[in-house]
């Protein structure tokens, strides 16, 4: 199936002295996996009733191992052995979607994310900051003219960077049961610089500096 709608199994291996000592992989629990196994659904909140489990990335933060995905799914907490524990919306503080590729600020230890949920949010994305305690401490909705496939973000000392790129949701494809994104050059391409600090107040979407750039798509920027 398409990558965003597929089942994936995270894996890990232990290396010592140039040799692999063990290897394991597991399916991440989800409503879909539970139904196929004729088991009860996994525990935890499912804000958009998605049947999919996180299928894109695994990372550790705030003492927890998380399986993550973009486009709306709730993160799933895993054990060290990659067994599914439950969905975990950062202990009840995440209002909706998350991402597969958050960024840790090395100076504060906080986790930053640009997130989208194409089926639920068609006119905005959301900036999320997770504190070092593993709880969301700040969110900001960022209006967009359409729903771009927001796969990643960048984080600098002064800015959180949002990529508003010409790969956008096509509802005809979605209703036909196909991969819901397509190349859309008429949409344009721009990069938004959201100030992380504004004197005397929190930054808003109106503070974003938008810069038009040539047509293209960046899955994973690097700075």
Please give the residue ranges for each predicted region.
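Beta-propeller domains
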Residues: 1-223
């Amino acid at each position: 199936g398409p990558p965003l709608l597929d089942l994936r199994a995270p894996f890990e291996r232990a290396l010592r002295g140039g040799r692999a000592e063990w290897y394991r992989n597991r399916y991440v629990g989800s409503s879909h996996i539970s139904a196929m196994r004729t088991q009860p659904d996994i525990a935890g909140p499912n804000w958009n009733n998605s049947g999919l489990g996180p299928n894109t990335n695994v990372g550790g933060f705030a003492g927890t191992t998380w399986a993550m995905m973009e486009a709306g799914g709730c993160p799933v907490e895993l054990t060290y052995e990659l067994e599914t524990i439950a969905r975990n919306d950062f202990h009840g503080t995440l209002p909706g979607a998350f991402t597969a590729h958050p960024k840790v600020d090395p100076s504060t230890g906080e986790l930053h994310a640009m997130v989208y949920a194409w089926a639920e949010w068609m006119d905005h994305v959301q900036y999320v900051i997770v504190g070092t305690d593993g709880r969301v401490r700040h969110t900001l909705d960022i209006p967009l003219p359409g729903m771009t496939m927001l796969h990643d973000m960048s984080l600098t000392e002064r800015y959180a960077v949002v990529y508003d790129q010409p790969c956008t949701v096509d509802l005809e494809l979605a209703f036909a049961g196909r991969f819901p994104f397509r190349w859309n050059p008429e949409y344009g391409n721009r990069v938004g610089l959201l100030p992380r600090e504004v004197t005397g107040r929190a930054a808003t979407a109106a503070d974003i500096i938008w810069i038009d750039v040539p047509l293209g798509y960046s899955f994973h920027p690097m700075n």
